Amino acid sequence: MPPSVCPPFSSAVVLCIDDDREVLECERSFLEAFGYTVLTASSCGKGLELASTQSVDVVILDYFMPTMNGQEVALEMRRLRQQAPIILLTEGEGVPAPTLNLVDAMVAKDRLASQLLPTIAYLHDCGRIPPLSYDA
């Protein structure tokens, strides 16, 4: 997506938490190319530590991780009063409703290139993605 469509927020800090280091590096490279400052954590514990000690504007969180899942990490962040919007990454599997109540947006990993920047921009400006309307 060209920068003119989704302008970067040069002061925004994005925390990416994923146990897959290759995914983290892709996220870092992609987001830094658009002017974001990126913090990465390859474990839930490190992610929670960074979220509690650094000023973070948006969190990108993988759902499936070995020691804690995305729901547990999001719950802990909310318990710690972490106010940064949370974007949950999934591989398309069903995500339990309680998890959806803890996060601000969800993006499928196979759609990162097209959906991640607009989602970050919206959350950074507005704080939460509006719920989908199923009315015809």
Residue positions per predicted region:
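His-Asp phosphorelay/catalytic-motif detector in bacterial-type signaling
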Residues: 55-57, 81-85
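Active-site residues of response regulator receiver
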Residues: 62
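Hydrophobic/aromatic residues positioned on beta-strands within the core alpha/beta folds
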Residues: 89-90
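Helix N-cap/capping motif at the beta->alpha junctions
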Residues: 40-49, 70
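Short amphipathic alpha-helix used as the core "switch/output" element in two-component signaling
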Residues: 49, 71-82
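Receiver (REC) domain active-site loop signature in two-component systems and cognate sites
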Residues: 65
